[in-house]
Regions:
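Flexible phosphate-sensing "switch/lid" loops adjacent to ATP/NTP-binding sites
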Residues: 11, 18-343, 350, 392-393, ...
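An internal, acidic/charged active-site-proximal segment
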Residues: 176, 338-345, 350, 366-382
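Catalytic nucleophile serine of serine hydrolases
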Residues: 355
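A conserved active-site-flanking secondary-structure segment within enzyme catalytic domains
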Residues: 362-418
Length: 517
């Protein structure tokens, strides 16, 4: 979608909003991390869209290695991009004005309004100094968003009751109070202790904060809901707040996940009878959503590994993006995975790198300005005749591109990287992709060795067909690639239907239209 199309859609949306009842903003806050706030928020973005509203997601501060480039070439958390997709609106930095991208256990890159403003350690970041300025920025972003959409669907972060961080919190109840949002507290019953986590979370809030909690939603329920009916009554009596839904655990709906904890459930071994594609488990792996489409492709088996024996069974090895390329390259050399990748390629495996993985495949990675850390130079895997020099300037943009051949269709993806990559001296340029603006991307040795800076490249079925072409003998009889965009739209609709069936939607609409004055 180009700028003109976005403007037309926005004008149409404003006209439509005039005829829709104004809803209060709604926030989904949690009793802890990974209770399902992001997915529930995405579900309600789609529900409100289906019901004729013009919703938009908002999370004041997100911490994630998976990010996305907006149409303006700025950076936001992947979860808000997914929620915007569910809402049917273009993603924008106002939906996630503050993004923290971990670089180590103690340090994160801080991205404000889509642009990096430096690295901060956790202690300095969570001190009071500078928080007022950040608070003004995130509140201003929310205000701009609220003027354009109805309703705004806010997402909290972690636990709503981290009382030691209360004075510096930017994302939970202080944001709900600024927005005047009705808060739904989400608890995860699957991990156990949901009564204590819900009741305890509420009791740790100050009275004026507790007044903002308008409903309780129990998520990830397994079993017969009738066995929990007495529990609903008990919770409502204890808390004085209605339970607005009990949403069952699901296995057959696919929504992109942002947190790296999702990797724990991925396959870790090769499988006979399909093209085996191994993704290297880097310590600082970022944008693992690049590979989600391959999990759904019936022709391949995708697995994540650092096991050198499993790598030897792979037909294709994918080196993913990294938030700390030099540190991950050092670790690959130390643990023997680098040697295993080189050996597998020598024995016939295809190796492809994306972003940081592309940099790792080269002859060397240089960081004389210490952009990433203390390591100034490391030799790469030597599979591509390129050299990368780290730079403090970040490239963030959506791109349209084709393969460097006259018959390639136009595809799309996005770039988020720091560093400039060039062919080593005396080596001819051999780009993998030609961008719509005439510039080039990546390096192509042959069909078994290539690299690119473009995230989302595998979301294009034409590129997957190109990548799998050398394995035609293994693909015979298997179905072809599928339309990933259509698949995702179907999944958003299925998620919305699943949540609709298990929440009291009339009560939620009543909450969002009630005069609280």
């Amino acid at each position: 979608m180009n700028g003109r199309d976005i403007r037309i859609c926005t004008i149409f949306a404003f006209a439509k909003m005039e005829f829709m009842e104004k809803l209060h903003p709604i926030m989904f806050a949690g009793t802890g991390s990974d209770v399902g706030k992001s997915i529930i928020a995405a579900a309600f973005c789609r529900i409100f869209k289906q019901d004729g509203y013009q919703p938009a997601p908002f999370k004041a501060q997100n911490m994630a290695l998976n990010s996305f480039a907006t149409p303006e070439g700025l950076e936001i958390g992947r979860a808000q991009a997914v929620q915007a997709e569910a809402a049917g609106v273009p993603c924008h930095t106002d939906m996630n004005p503050l993004l923290l991208k971990p670089q180590s256990d103690h340090t994160s890159q801080v991205v404000l309004n889509g642009r990096p403003i430096g690295n901060r350690n956790a202690y300095d970041y969570f001190r009071k100094e500078g928080r007022d300025e950040l608070r003004r920025e995130v509140c201003a972003a929310y205000d701009r968003l609220a003027a354009r959409y109805n309703p705004v669907v806010l997402e909290g972060a972690g636990s709503i009751s981290e009382i030691n961080l209360r004075d510096t919190d930017l994302v939970n109840l202080p944001m709900a109070l600024h927005a005047g949002a009705d808060v739904i507290l989400v608890g995860d019953i699957d991990r156990g202790g949901v009564f204590a986590s819900v009741y305890g979370s509420l009791m740790l809030l100050r009275p004026h904060e507790r007044e903002r909690i308008k409903g309780i939603l129990i998520n990830k329920f397994r079993g017969d809901i009738r066995l929990f009916e007495s529990g609903i009554t008990m919770l409502e009596e204890l808390c004085g707040i209605p339970v607005v839904g009990v949403v069952p655990y699901y296995r057959d709906i696919y929504i992109e996940e942002e947190d790296s904890v999702a990797l724990a459930a991925k396959s870790v071994r090769a499988e006979k009878g399909k093209v085996n594609i191994a993704v290297i488990l880097l310590r600082h792996l970022s944008n693992f959503t690049d590979f989600n489409v391959l999990e759904r492709d019936p022709r391949v088996h995708l697995f994540y590994t650092n096991n050198v024996d499993e790598l030897a069974k792979a037909d294709v090895i994918l080196l993913p993006g990294s938030k700390s390329t030099l540190d991950d390259l050092y670790e690959l050399r130390r643990n023997g995975v680098a040697a295993a990748i080189i050996r597998a390629h020598r024995e016939g495996a295809t190796v492809m790198g994306i972003c940081g993985g592309y940099q790792i495949m080269g002859q060397e990675v240089l960081d004389p300005e210490h952009v990433e850390g203390d390591i100034e130079r490391l030799p790469g895997l030597g599979l591509l005749p390129i050299s990368t020099r780290m730079s403090g300037e970040k490239v963030t943009r959506q791109v349209k591109f084709g393969l460097c051949n006259p018959h390639s269709p136009l595809m799309q993806g996005y770039e988020i990287h720091m560093g400039v990559t060039t062919p080593v001296e005396g080596t001819p340029d051999s780009p993998l992709n030609l961008l719509e603006n005439g510039s080039t991307d990546g390096y192509y040795v042959d069909s078994t060795c290539m690299g690119t800076y473009i995230h989302g490249i595998l979301d294009n079925p034409e590129f997957i067909d190109f990548l799998l072409a050398p394995f035609a003998d293994k693909l015979s009889g298997n179905a072809g690639a599928f339309d990933y965009h259509t698949f995702k739209e179907e999944q958003y609709d299925r998620l919305a239907e699943h949540v609709r069936r298990h929440v009291n939607l009339p009560l939620i609409y009543q909450i969002l239209t009630k005069n609280h004055d």
